[in-house]
Curated annotation (Swiss-Prot):
It comes from Caenorhabditis elegans. Keywords: Coiled coil, Guanine-nucleotide releasing factor. This is Rho guanine nucleotide exchange factor osg-1. Residues 1-12 have a biased composition (Acidic residues). Residues 357-544 form the DH domain. Residues 1-96, 863-884 are annotated as: Disordered. GO terms for cellular component: cytoplasm. The keyword Secreted does not apply. Disruption phenotype: Viable with normal development, size and lifespan. Reduced sensitivity to factors that induce neurodegeneration. Improved chemosensory response in aging worms. One of its GO terms (biological process) is response to oxidative stress. PANTHER family: RHO GUANINE NUCLEOTIDE EXCHANGE FACTOR, RHO GUANINE NUCLEOTIDE EXCHANGE FACTOR 17. Residues 69-78 have a biased composition (Basic and acidic residues). GO terms for molecular function: guanyl-nucleotide exchange factor activity. The lineage of its organism: Eukaryota, Metazoa, Ecdysozoa, Nematoda, Chromadorea. Residues 29-41 have a biased composition (Polar residues).
Length: 1182
């Protein structure tokens, strides 16, 4: 009998064995929640052929098998849920069906939602109570399911720790999810903490978000999530990637505390606290990016926070003031965050290893510093100090010692302080020890930086001095002995270069310490700053080391391409710029080179077969593509701006800028006027008129900038032999003019500052040969060598009232030696002068003849504006085969003329001029020789001219008419005039015209000018037995300044015996004057030698006089500058093309010779018996 409720037997089992439970297939996380019921097995149908008697038993057995299968399926499902595999697709959610009424209660509990949504939800619920749910409820239900899925995957706890006490039951999944997601701006995708196991999911995306959640936040951006510090630590523990940037929200009710970031300063806290309540955070974050934003926008901030706080990007390098970021360092932010994450992720063992390596680096810094200081101490104690001792000072000159060990004591003092501080810190080492402040304090000191730079600048001169000193056998033996005494057998060169090599070593050690210093360590910021200072010092050292060589090479290139320019390369000379100019009144282009102490004006001519291309005058291609010829050379100290038009240029620029601003405003007003609805015709016409007028003003100002000569020209005054002459430079436009003038002023200021600095001098003393006591040094002169580049010799005369003696000293070797010493004449020597060989006129190279008056009045502008760029149109002179001679005069009226290459012998009497009166002064003047004689009130001035054969006509001197009433005591040539001192008057005599300038009375009538020295535009003089120096202008002979030296000498003698001090002060007077290297040198009867800059002596009523450490026991009688190698004294056409203070050839070295009685070094250790012996002190000025 068939049972209609039974199925057929096609699906049944034929045996009586219980059915095997089929395991439920594993569900993937990508399966939609709506398909979860499809995995339940269908009910098994019974067999249709079973009889009635077995029906009940089968049903019972079937029920038991179904219970077993259900139990097995439940166990399998739980196991599958525990081993759930996460993917990028939608996760499965095993949640019960959503209760709509519970969801409505949840929504009604929201304060903002109550007022707007309660009625709408109730109305729709009432209207749809018996039917289907509305679309909004369906959307809300889907949203709740999605949020439940998000909560499931993130496994975020649904209640805080305060709920554990039973005050609140476990929240419904929907309620907890809404509360934590809708009303929180925390990055929900990063809150993957498991409530049961307390762990994070091990799978995350590149942005730090768990996989499988991305479809819920499709518009997510990288800068909208900020994980809390707790989540950040969990992120590190599971080795996940870190977001590239974060966004923080500033809360009014709970301000974010500021913490100290050790890298850049005070910044906002990087991550918000993990203890902050989720309910206190706005719902801005998820609502703005979720696909249900339309619905969640109704859940905006609660009434307690009506305003949304602006989001501020977190930046660990920014010091925020008032909520505003002052700087952005995006790349450094990411790197700094990565550093923090990496250091926090390290284990304790790894941190211990890093701290250990950091300690080793600090120990290495200390050990290498000790070794470096020991090397410097070896230099000072074994080399420098012994070589300055009296026992060893004869090995090499003191000047070489100072040049070799320049700045070594200062460097040693700085590093001894650093070593002491490092030792104290490292001896008390711990993991939080700080060294950055020590290094920062050391390398940020300006004195230390200047010391290193000066040392590097002098380094190549120090090496050259070592080579020079090792040429002496005695020093070579001492040098080898010191090398053997050194622990590492290092020579002097290796020890001297150690300061330069030390600086990069500091940088390497500091980098090693930074590598092993945690990011949040207090020392890291200081180490970073110290590293920057060390790096800047290393770069400066390299620049100064290579810059001087590059500048020297560039000067040599300019010297090679400029025809007629020689000896341009000197120490500390640099090229500043070069420009194309035109001189006033001409249309020819000239090139002006501005150097640190010189101006060169040259002609410009393009080279043939060179394609012309428009290039900047500052480019090297411009120099290579043109030919240059020197026209004029001007010392920078001889130039001054005569007409200040820069202020006028600045005024025009201000007017032009104002007009341009007005033009922009008028155009904007016209645009706004066109929007008016009322009548605007009159206003539009007014605006058009104003705009037209303003445009014309702009055009006129632009034309004035380019065409006005006052704005594009620089008016200079150049000091020449004729006085100050105008020199107008016209530039292509006002901009280039302003740049040139600004650089010119800076160069003048720098040069004046350098001239104020006293030159460093060293000394060497020799004893002048004396045949008998009683001879006093009276006069000296410098005689050039046989060639222009050969070393000069020094001729010194000593005499008593009955005879004279001439000593010739050679300076061409390292040692100063006395070549010869011969007697000359039977009277006291009163005057001596070096006279260049006579000149003969050569033929003129142009057809037109110029009058003598025109040649005398020829100015710089005339020379540079001439039509020819080849040869000068004036009379030029060339030397004959004659030799340089030395003229020596005595009280008997005899003038001895001696060749510079001959020894002083009795046959010198063959060339002798016998005059009536005693000789008082001799001066060489433009190819002639002036000799002054006097007897009682008879004053005579004689002019000796060269003969036709090139010799001197000593038999027929020409008498020069004059108005001098007193004996002529001194004559000095400057330019085209000779300054003559007669009594208390100064006279100026023009050799070319034979005319005198009106004399000027300088001293009182009771005094007489006995000493005079002329340099540039200054005349320094003083009276007989006077301690006051007068400064007179060389052109108008007016007194500029005067000062006294008594106070400086008294201060120098303050430590001497009372009797000696009173004796020297009682008879104190100025005994000699000279000028060398822009410094005035003053010798006194007390034996003291003083010096000051010419600029100070000219401008200051009490200049800062520097007293030399070593002087003479008796009076200092002669001060004489000696240039080595000396330049020829022959007048040449180049001297006519130079300013007053430009020498014909730059000297490589300057020596100042001080001649006097005895030697006084301030130690009172000299033998008193040598106080009356003549000594010569050679000061070598660098």
């Amino acid at each position: 009998m068939l049972n209609p409720n039974d199925a057929d037997d096609s699906d049944s089992s034929t045996d009586s064995s219980p059915p095997v439970a089929v395991p439920r297939p594993k569900r993937s996380a990508t399966v939609s929640p709506s398909t979860r019921n499809s995995f339940y097995n269908s009910r098994r149908r019974s067999d249709a052929n079973l009889n009635f008697f077995n029906e009940r038993e089968r049903q019972r057995e079937r029920r038991r098998s179904m219970v077993r299968a259900s139990r097995e399926r439940s166990e399998s499902r739980r196991a599958s849920q525990q081993n759930l595999r996460k993917t990028n697709s939608e996760p499965n959610v095993d949640m019960p069906s959503i209760d709509v009424e519970a969801l409505q209660k949840l929504l009604l509990s929201i304060p903002k939602f109550v007022s707007a949504s309660r009625n709408r939800i109730n109305q729709r619920h009432d209207s749809d109570s018996g039917g289907e749910m509305t679309t909004e409820i369906e959307e809300l239900k889907d949203a709740a399911k999605s949020i439940q899925s998000l909560q499931r995957v993130l496994a975020y706890p649904s209640q805080t720790s305060s709920d554990r006490g039973g005050n609140r039951r476990l929240a419904d999944p929907v309620e907890s999810c809404l509360e934590s997601s809708v009303f929180s701006d925390v990055d929900e995708s990063s809150l993957a903490t498991d409530t049961i196991e307390g762990r994070r999911s091990g799978i995350s995306t590149r942005l730090g978000h768990p996989r499988g959640v991305m479809q819920f936040i499709p518009s997510i951006r990288n800068d909208q999530f900020v994980p809390t510090s707790e989540i950040r630590r969990n992120s590190i523990s599971r080795k996940s990637s870190v977001p590239d940037g974060f966004m923080t929200s500033e809360m009014e009710s709970e301000p974010v505390p500021n913490v100290r970031n050790r890298r850049r300063g005070i910044v906002d806290e990087m991550f918000s606290s993990s203890t902050s309540l989720l309910v206190d955070r706005p719902s801005e974050t998820l609502a703005g990016v979720n696909r249900f934003a339309k619905l969640l926008d109704t859940f905006r901030s609660r009434p307690t926070s009506p305003e949304q706080h602006p989001s501020i990007s977190w930046n660990p390098y920014v010091y925020s003031d008032g909520g505003e970021a002052l700087e952005t360092c995006g790349m450094e932010d990411s790197l700094h965050e990565a550093d923090i994450l990496l250091w926090k992720k390290r284990s304790r063992a790894s941190l211990r290893r890093h701290y250990s390596v950091r300690h080793l680096a600090a120990r290495e810094l200390l050990d290498t510093e000790k070794s470096f200081v020991e090397g410097l101490e070896f230099l000072v104690t074994k080399y420098m100090r012994p070589l300055r001792q009296p026992l060893e000072c004869t090995l090499i000159e003191a000047s070489l010692v100072d040049k070799i060990f320049y700045r070594i004591p200062e460097i040693l003092a700085h590093h001894q302080v650093l070593l002491t501080t490092l030792s104290q810190r490292i001896d008390q080492w711990h993991k939080d020890a700080i060294l950055g402040d020590v290094l920062l304090a050391h390398f940020s000191k300006q004195s230390m930086i200047e010391t290193y730079i000066s040392f590097v600048d002098n380094f190549k001169f120090a090496k050259a001095s070592i080579i020079q000193a090792r040429q002496k056998h005695a020093f070579e033996k001492y040098y080898n002995r010191c090398c053997r005494d050194h622990p590492n057998k290092l020579d002097l060169d290796s020890l001297l270069i150690s300061p330069i090599q030390r600086v990069p070593r500091y940088e390497l050690i500091v980098k090693q310490m930074l590598k092993h210093t945690p990011v949040e360590h207090e020392d890291r910021e200081r180490l970073l700053r110290a590293q920057r200072h060390i790096h800047c010092l290393a770069v400066a050292i390299n620049q100064h080391k290579d810059g001087s060589e590059q500048m020297e090479q560039r000067l040599r290139e300019i010297e090679a391409i400029v025809d007629g320019l020689d000896d341009l390369v000197t120490k500390d000379r640099t090229l500043l710029r070069h420009d194309i100019i035109t001189l006033k009144g001409t249309d020819r282009e000239r090139c002006i080179f501005m150097l640190s102490d010189l101006l060169l004006v040259t002609s410009v001519k393009k080279k043939p077969k060179v394609l012309y291309s428009k290039m900047s005058s500052q480019s090297m291609g411009f120099l290579e593509g043109n030919r240059f010829k020197l026209l004029f050379k001007v010392a920078l100290e001889d130039v001054q701006i005569s007409k200040d038009t820069l202020s006028q240029l600045e005024e025009v620029e201000r007017k032009l800028e104002s007009s341009r601003e007005d033009d922009r405003v008028l155009k904007k007003m016209s645009q706004l006027c066109s929007l008016l609805k009322c009548e605007r015709k009159v206003l539009m016409e007014m605006l058009e008129t104003m705009e037209t007028s303003n445009s014309m003003s702009i055009r006129e100002l632009n034309e004035q900038m380019s065409s006005d000569p006052d704005l594009s020209a620089v008016h200079l005054d150049v000091l020449t032999s004729n006085g100050f002459e105008p020199f107008v430079l016209e530039f292509p436009n006002a901009e280039k003019r302003s740049v040139f003038e600004a650089m010119f002023k800076d160069a003048k200021a720098t040069l004046a500052k350098n001239l104020l600095a006293a030159p460093s001098c060293s000394l060497k003393t020799i004893i002048a040969h004396q045949t008998r006591p009683g001879l006093q040094l009276c006069t000296a002169t410098v005689v050039p060598g046989k060639r222009v580049d050969s070393t000069p010799s020094l001729w010194v005369c000593a005499s008593d009232k009955f005879s004279g003696q001439v000593a010739v000293m050679a300076l061409d070797t390292g040692e100063i030696t006395i070549e010869s010493c011969s007697a000359i004449g039977n009277a006291a020597v009163t005057a001596m002068c070096t006279v260049p060989p006579p000149m003969k006129l050569r033929k003129r190279k142009i057809k037109s003849q110029k009058s003598l008056e025109h040649l005398l009045n020829e100015t710089i502008m005339d020379i540079n504006s001439s039509g020819s760029d080849t040869e000068s149109s004036s009379d030029e002179g060339t030397s004959t085969a004659g030799q340089t001679t030395v003229w020596i005069g005595n009280d008997d009226g005899e003038v001895f003329v001696v060749n510079s290459t001959e020894r002083v012998r009795s046959r010198a009497r063959d060339r002798l001029a016998r005059l009536r009166n005693s000789i008082t002064s001799i001066c060489a003047a433009n190819g002639n020789v002036l000799v002054a004689t006097s007897y009682s009130n008879q004053v005579q001035l004689l002019l000796f001219r060269p003969a036709s054969d090139g010799s001197w006509d000593l038999e027929n001197p020409q008498t020069v008419g004059h108005v001098c009433q007193a004996p002529i005591t001194s004559m000095q040539l400057i330019g085209r005039r000779v300054i003559i001192a007669s009594g208390n008057w100064l006279h100026a005599y023009f050799v070319d015209t034979g005319k005198f300038q009106p004399p000027v009375e300088i001293l009182p009538s009771s005094d007489v000018i006995t000493l005079m020295y002329v340099t540039g535009q200054n005349v320094f003089l003083c009276g007989r037995k006077s301690t006051e120096v007068f400064v007179v202008d060389v052109f108008n002979l007016s007194i500029i300044n005067h000062f006294n030296v008594v106070s400086f000498v008294r201060s120098q003698l303050s430590g001497r015996e009372h009797i000696l001090r009173e004796h020297k002060m009682g008879c104190l007077r100025i005994s000699c004057l000279t000028v060398a290297r822009s410094h005035l040198w003053i010798g006194t009867s007390a034996g003291c030698v003083l010096s000051t800059s010419v600029q100070s002596a000219r401008s200051q009523p009490t200049p800062d006089l520097r007293v030399c450490e070593i002087g003479h026991s008796g009076p200092c009688r002669i001060l004489l500058p000696v240039h080595t190698p000396s330049h020829s004294n022959h007048p040449s056409r180049k001297q006519k093309r130079s300013s007053l203070n430009v020498p014909a050839q730059q000297s490589s070295q300057l020596m100042l010779v001080s001649c006097g009685e005895g030697l006084d070094d301030g130690t009172a250790t000299q033998d008193p018996s040598t106080d009356a012996i003549n000594h010569l002190i050679f000061w070598k000025c660098s």
